[in-house]
Amino acid sequence: MKSPALQSLSMAGLQLMTPASSPMGPFFGLPWQQEAIHDNIYTPRKYQVELLEAALDHNTIVCLNTGSGKTFIAVLLTKELSYQIRGDFNKNGKRTVFLVNSANQVAQQVSAVRTHSDLKVGEYSSLEVTESWTKEKWSQEFSKHQVLVMTCHVALTVLRNEYLSLSNINLLVFDECHLAIQDHPYREIMKICEDYPSCPRILGLTASILNGKCDPAELEEKIKKLEKILKSNAETATDLVVLDRYTSQPCEIVVDCGPYTDKSGLYGRLLRELDEALHFLNDCNISVHSKERDSTLISKQILSDCRAVLVVLGPWCADKVAGMMVRELQKYIKHEQEELHRKFLLFTDTFLRKIHALCEEHFSPASLDLKFVTPKVIKLLEILRKYKPYERQQFESVEWYNNRNQDNYVSWSDSEDDDEDEEIEEKEKPETNFPSPFTNILCGIIFVERRYTAVVLNRLIKEAGKQDPELAYISSNFITGHGIGKNQPRNKQMEVEFRKQEEVLRKFRAHETNLLIATSIVEEGVDIPKCNLVVRFDLPTEYRSYVQSKGRARAPISNYIMLADTDKIKSFEEDLKTYKAIEKILRNKCSKSVDTSETETEPIVDDDDVFPPYVLRTDENSPRVTINTAIGHINRYCARLPSDPFTHLAPKCKTRELPDHTFYSTLYLPINSPLRASIVGPPMSCARLAERVVALICCEKLHKIGELDDHLMPVGKETVKYEEELDLHDEEETSVPGRPGSTKRRQCYPKAIPECLRDSYPKPDQPCYLYVIGMVLTTPLPDELNFRRRKLYPPEDTTRCFGILTAKPIPQIPHFPVYTRSGEVTISIELKKSGFTLSLQMLELITRLHQYIFSHILRLEKPALEFKPTEADSAYCVLPLNIVDDSSTLDIDFKFMEDIEKSEARTGIPSTQYTKEMPFIFKLEDYQDAVIIPRYRNFDQPHRFYVADVYTDLTPLSKFPSPEYETFAEYYKTKYNLDLTNLNQPLLDVDHTSSRLNLLTPRHLNQKGKALPLSSAEKRKAKWESLQNKQILVPELCAIHPIPASLWRKAVCLPSILYRLHCLLTAEELRAQTATDAGVGVKSLPADFRYPNLDFGWKKSIDSKSFISIPSSSLVENENYCKHSTIVVPENAAHQGANRTSSAEKHDQMSVSYRTLLDESPSKLQIDVSAELAAINGVSYNKNLANGNCDLVNRDFCQGNQLNYCRQEIPVQPTTSYPIQNLYSSENQPKPSNECTLLSNKYLDGNANRSTSDGCPKMTVTTSTSTALNLSKDKVDSEKNTSSGYSSKTLGPNPGLILQALTLSNASDGFNLERLEMLGDSFLKHAITTYLFCTYPDAHEGRLSYMRSKKVSNCNLYRLGKKKGLPSRMVVSIFDPPVNWLPPGYIVNQDKSNTDKWEKEETTKENLLANGKLDYDDDDEEDEDLMWRLPKEETDFEDDFLEYDQEHIKFIDSMLMGSGAFVKKISLSHFSTTDSNYEWKAPKKSSLGNVPFSSDFDDFDYSSWDAMCYLDPSKAVEEDDFVVGFWNPSEENCGVDAGKQSISYDLHTEQCIADKSIADCVEALLGCYLTSCGERAAQLFLCSLGLKVLPVIKKTDWESTLCATGENCNSEQKNLSPNSVSACIVNSEPSLYKDLEYGCLKIPPRCMFDHPDAEKTLNHLISGFENFEKKINYSFKNKAYLLQAFTHASYHYNTITDCYQRLEFLGDAILDYLITKHLYEDPRQHSPGVLTDLRSALVNNTIFASLAVKYDYHKYFKAVSPELFHVIDDFVQFQMEKNEMQGMDSELRRSEEDEEKEEDIEVPKAMGDIFESLAGAIYMDSGMSLEMVWQVYYPMMRPLIEKFSANVPRSPVRELLEMEPETAKFSPAERTYDGKVRVTVEVVGKGKFKGVGRSYRIAKSAAARRALRSLKANQPQVPNS
């Protein structure tokens, strides 16, 4: 569409070409096709870029608009030519000179050059100062500085006196060069240049060549003159000539609106009134002192605004504006102090009300009456009606919009934007939001002159839309240029305005509004989409305004309509002619101008004649590129290359004329395209053809290298080339709902059974193996946890113990702890004898006893389980052993088994009757080690008690503790009608036998190993010391059980021992399997080797708040342990008195040293505590105190109040399980049993502190108070306990560590996989990244990252993990023997098992009791049913509850239930206790979506508890101990779609796991191999899983690689000691993949392109970089890497290397891994939650960008992108002001005070990118050495790592969810027009907060930050309850 001649249209026939009516169909030119792809010309580049090209090529005068990039061009030109000015001045080095007109402009230029380059800049502004300088002084200046910024006067002096000769200047920049036309120093300077033979390059900058009105002829004259004076060509920026030179011009129309007929006379009346009032104000003769405000000023302003609205828009609008102004005035009147001023304001107020009254006589203000608006308005509405979309289009267009295939495209959602910023009258409803069926077609701007016109016109259009269905589609808004300019000083008022304006613009960009009414400010510099309608409501008064507004109409079909009043139309047509002429002149000056008409006139060439098309196949409709379509293909290809939001990559085409008047073109593609060489086309007859032909040739090349697909479209990132990488698998078909790999999808898996326990039931006369279960009390329970003052019973004191009899050998596994009432007991499984046989009846006896243990002692039998040892999957015998016949060895205790068979009390209650004749006789020895059964109650399931003490001073006649009964005898008589025959017998103090069978973790610690708060320990001790609270029984009324108490105590440990054994064997099996598959480790362990003990890593992992680091003195302890852990302490050792005293003395000294210690500074404490503890925990301690002599220590330890002092200073969390315990008891905390896995298990951390890098040994010895020793592989001493020098490095990881990697946090065990998973996750990313980088040197970043994301996706990891059989081996739910443990020899009876199937409705109360389920927790020991409480306590069921303090009852079941994916109702009737003072709290509604810490709550696997719990954060007491309340999953909102079917599975043999948990497990195992065996092993492990991260080499190449290993094997493999062949071939074991051996990655060969003068270019490009190398302390061997790391994709001057994207991809993964590894190895042992937070605080773009700026990266950055230039500029300024970093905030903020308003400053992603790319460059340059990278980066990062570790920054999102877990809801993302994302967070009842950012994550955190700010601001008003 050529720009038609001016059409002056009368009102009648206004024909507009609107998109809807366009012949090209409704979608041609929809406004949101943001960048239309041009087909016949190359995509135009940014005008600043073109101007820079010109300036590099020849002397140039750049004519620009104000502020649009003069500095950009000047600074970049200086940088491009900087290689010429780095030389020594005295040896002919050159200098760059910047000339400015006045002194105050000097600083500005100086700072720009300093910010963006490392050049040294001298500034000379004052003539007075410099006049006196001598030549020498100047020479010094010139030597010191490379760029000289001077005022023109100084420069003139310097040149005239020849202090600096022109031959030493390489570039002369004239700012405001138009001054050279007049008499000005610039003119003089140019004269000097004229006479000089070699003149420097000249750059003139001017913004004011067009000021105000200007005659075209004059303008042309002026430009010519300037060109002559400056010896340059003038180039204008395209923003002065409308638009990109290429796109079609808008259709320009001038509309004559006709006169206004004032039928009602209202208009005239109002006009008169207003004129009179204004006249009056002007007449008021008030003396105004210059200092004072003019009292009439405001009034005049208001009335003249009102008059303007009346004239332009008519009475209806004048009425509206009067109403608005009255409201404004009220504010002024209220605040006005001065009488006179007030009077005028009141006058105005009255006057406006009068106007309103006048209008009301004529029309009702509520509805719009078109009689009362001006013809302009009517015309405008008419135009708008033309844009009404066709109805049918609604759907297509919305559809089309939402189906754009962009990966990052976020779907629209109904954004609930209430327009608070408009003055909407209450009755108006806010505008309807996107997506309305229409919004899509119109995208228009109406330009008006005054602010008020904009406001009222907007109101009018809204009103019209309500009344006229034709206009209903319009959704308008207004914007008045308040403080929109980028760099104006900001004040609060403006901030508010600014935010509003931003929001209006955002909506317009997002097409939520389709019409914008704007004042002229929007003409300039504001980023607005391409409009298809621009209306000038008021005519443009000068060229600039005309061009700017016209330039907004950029849609392919657009109208530029100027509304003129009849009287103005003549004069305006004149103006318009002038504007057109000026435009033409400027267009000729336009850089690279192409006469646009050529495009239109030139016929489409019949391509085949000129140049044959490129055809793929010969058939008819084969895809082809012709000479006419080629350019479009190239443009499309470039647009698809990876780039940042600021850079739109475009091809560059240069066309030159040959002497014979033919033309040839050279085409350069963007530098991140694999096709790097420039393409030269053949000579053609005209330039246009030359350009097309070269494009065609280029298409052919691109297709051949696989960059265009077979339809000749750009290949996406899912490229065919890399198929093999993606290993496209068919996802298995399952009926399971949910996306594979996500947490939402769960499946059931059988629980694994270790091979060695499968079918290993001994058979008669077949050889057997007998193992003894050794039990040694290694850490007795400390005093302050021993509330009952119970005696401790070390298991090693009695010889009778349990053994395991099997038919297969059991591999060696580490010793492990269980936690009994006596403390920590270390369990070992030792082979006693093998190869012997047993007869049938012996086996039968053993089998009967085995069943007896599980069914009667442990009461684990229930209807669902049947004892069938021959059919059971896991079958072996548990049997008692003892020292037989004086020999000192243990053997099977047959005698004991036979005795039990005979005993009467074996299963029931014996019926012995005592009478007066045969009274009961008390024998003390019978009761010393006895379990007794009361014979008078609970006959079906008698209670069993341990005898704790024999009270010889009490008899049945002693006084009964409670007043109801006189004596014990009376109590029994009254209550049970029992007579005693022996009244002298002593009484027994008894303890319940334990019903808590899960002894895997200590019950006084939560999973962090942090003491649970003890509710007022003092109170408890008192309670247990008074007789009232003891259970006292009479021997005569009890039967003695045949099993002695000592053995019973061991039997209680059996479920935990066997369960742990089972898990460790599964882990050991996995280790052996990996040894086979991956060749890492050995298949079967050496006979003399045992791994160090399983350890929870607690003793040293101190709670994250206190961070006491463990100093080296803790080594002592480990050495002691080494001795200890292999010796089973002989029983008698503990009884040697001598030792005892010595240890007591030792402790005395110790307590003394403690006191002195505490008087010193707390920091000292940090050091010595562990040393002293090490002393306590040494061997002697364990031996001697095993006997209960531990009071001493602890009392000494906590004497006095010195510890309280310590408590205020540093909150030390207990480092061991004994000292300082009651410090932490907070008064009213509930005391969970250890099964209560509060959510803190999310933080659990049991992993020992291991270093992952093999290279540098770090001090990572872990201390531990149990015998458990944690092997740290770098520490040689720690291997003492392994008799010969094996280490986990050669043998494979400790099964304990593997078990940790298999244990989910829901298992509530002492450890879980979370820390390892994080380490594995970052190593995985690193390994895959490095592999892809090295294997595909041609793939650009987009593709690499697509391949990476496919490989590391949870879905892929889940698949590999499943293939490897991990799900069965994982530990996913809490160990709860009565519910989900299958004892050996048992099978699940399918018919009866439904009680344990999840689907079954209620389990009845009886059933619960029968299974012993409610006897849960060891707390029942605390609240045994005291006989003398309430008569109704007979129902043993309530016993457990009655005695709880109220705060204990907060939860009973204390188990964290899984995500409620079975919608199983829970009847609270199980729990209805009759105790009136206890009430159940009704379950709160919990919306699981946002529970603290766990964003995906579904990770919890279902544990087996019938009462489900949720966290009630409102009761959160301390950092992360939560109170658990009941949560009834059948409520709505529980995070589960109600429709989800419940999964039914058997708890004993199956487990249900979310896919994502399996992926996590794979990562954790990787972390486990990495920490234990090193990086190479971890890579091999990945390969064996099926994730290729190493190249495969053929068998034959192996030898050759071996020789090379020493020199170039990358550093990760160096430590495999190349000298020993076996060490290097890690796969020395026969590998599963016989034919696969893995080699080492090779560094991609070329990093520089072959290029004739590559070396020279390289030196030019990196001149000055040596300073940077000094700064980072690393010197590059291959400088090309250095250049590449700093080259942005837009920097096309670099023709020799790639851009930084690939290196950034590599560096990103390297830094992530190095930082994660560093944090993981931190001796402070951060918990998983803290690790995650630290990692995200440190590995993010903001931090990287800030560091990059701090270390001057930006000064070396090479990019040609104006927007990026400005963002970096802003950011650098901001950093300088701030000089202080914030964590987590991805968008940094300007000022701290009043943060509500200040604008988030944008962090240039490119800065973070080069920070990463440099890391990648160092990695490649140093031969893949991670150490080298860390050596350079750690010093830079260290301050931040330290700062954050000491004070962990929380992500705003997490903080908000922790603050408002129930009420904060995040909306889905909404896309804004400019490609940003908006997220709204609603905090129910407290408001909605929006955040906008470049990604969902950034937006979400911005929203959360706003919400937090607001919540925190409002907090104090809440009264503290």
Curated annotation (Swiss-Prot):
Binds 2 magnesium or manganese ions per subunit. ATP binds at L64, N65, T66, G67, S68, G69, K70, T71. Residues 895-1042 form the PAZ domain. Residues 1848-1913 form the DRBM domain. Residues 51-227 form the Helicase ATP-binding domain. Its EC number is 3.1.26.3. A motif (DECH box) lies at residues 175-178. Residues 433-602 form the Helicase C-terminal domain. Mg(2+) 1 binds at E1317, D1396, E1399. Keywords: ATP-binding, Cytoplasm, Endonuclease, Helicase, Hydrolase, Magnesium, Manganese, Metal-binding, Nuclease, Nucleotide-binding, Phosphoprotein, Repeat, RNA-binding, RNA-mediated gene silencing. It is found in: Cytoplasm. InterPro entries: DEAD/DEAH_box_helicase_dom, Dicer_dimer_sf, Dicer_dimerisation_dom, DICER_DSRM, Dicer_PBD, Dicer_platform, dsRBD_dom, Helicase_ATP-bd. Mg(2+) 2 binds at E1704, D1809, E1812. It catalyses: Endonucleolytic cleavage to 5'-phosphomonoester. Component of the RISC loading complex (RLC), or micro-RNA (miRNA) loading complex (miRLC), which is composed of DICER1, AGO2 and TARBP2; DICER1 and TARBP2 are required to process precursor miRNAs (pre-miRNAs) to mature miRNAs and then load them onto AGO2. Note that the trimeric RLC/miRLC is also referred to as RISC. Belongs to the helicase family. Dicer subfamily. This is Endoribonuclease Dicer. The gene is DICER1.
